[in-house]
Amino acid sequence: MSKETLKANLREIPDFPIPGILFYDVTTLFKNPECLQEILDTLYEMYKDKGITKVVGIESRGFIMGGALAARLGAGFVMARKPGKLPAEVVEETYAKEYGTDTIQIHKDAIDENDVVLLHDDLLATGGTMAATHRLVQRCGAKKIFINFIIELGGLNGRKAFPEDITVDTLLTL
């Protein structure tokens, strides 16, 4: 999928969720069947030969392509969620945000030392949530970890949140 096609199908909403913020709404990419298929096909081609055994999707828009990609890759799908959303025993990572802290959790038995894991979310801004998820999956003993986003907000330097030896892929940088 061309970057121009992605950008043309991405909705921009000014002053959301607060004044002064330009929100990039990826739901317009998901409601367009051609875009949805192209994104899935592109992600599949990027990771089909990496030996991925688990895809971790970050709540909540990371669930959409993460689940579809896991099925296409023949991998398991793991949900990374905010506290109180997962029913079994969890492991968690707390991380700093601009105003306070937040926590991300996965089931304790979701990842093990034999897993090659792809972490997926829709958009890379500051990288805080994904960096916490990366640390969490590392603690679970994953053999190898890849990170992917559909969109990257380049001006926010979110890649700095990750160790230099981690591959971070995006389909479109704005």
From Swiss-Prot:
GO cellular component: cytoplasm
Location of this chain's protein in the cell: Cytoplasm
Annotated metabolic or biological route of this protein: Purine metabolism; AMP biosynthesis via salvage pathway; AMP from adenine: step 1/1
Swiss-Prot/TrEMBL keywords: Cytoplasm, Glycosyltransferase, Purine salvage, Transferase
GO MF terms, alphabetically ordered: adenine phosphoribosyltransferase activity
Protein EC: 2.4.2.7
The reaction(s) this protein catalyses: AMP + diphosphate = 5-phospho-alpha-D-ribose 1-diphosphate + adenine
Pfam name, any one: Pribosyltran
GO annotation, biological process: adenine salvage; AMP salvage; purine ribonucleoside salvage
InterPro entries hit by this protein: Ade_phspho_trans (IPR005764), Adenine_PRTase (IPR050120), PRibTrfase_dom (IPR000836), PRTase-like (IPR029057)
Database matches in Gene3D superfamilies: 3.40.50.2020
Keyword Cytoplasm: yes
Primary site of residence: cytoplasm
The UniProt record lists the keyword S-adenosyl-L-methionine: no
CDD domains, per database record: PRTases_typeI
Disulphide bond pairs: none
Subunit structure: Homodimer.
UniProt xrefs under NCBIfam families: apt, PRK02304.1-3, PRK02304.1-5
Role this protein plays: Catalyzes a salvage reaction resulting in the formation of AMP, that is energically less costly than de novo synthesis.
HAMAP family recorded: Aden_phosphoribosyltr
Similarity remark: Belongs to the purine/pyrimidine phosphoribosyltransferase family.
Name of the protein: Adenine phosphoribosyltransferase
Organism per entry: Phocaeicola vulgatus (strain ATCC 8482 / DSM 1447 / JCM 5826 / CCUG 4940 / NBRC 14291 / NCTC 11154) (Bacteroides vulgatus)
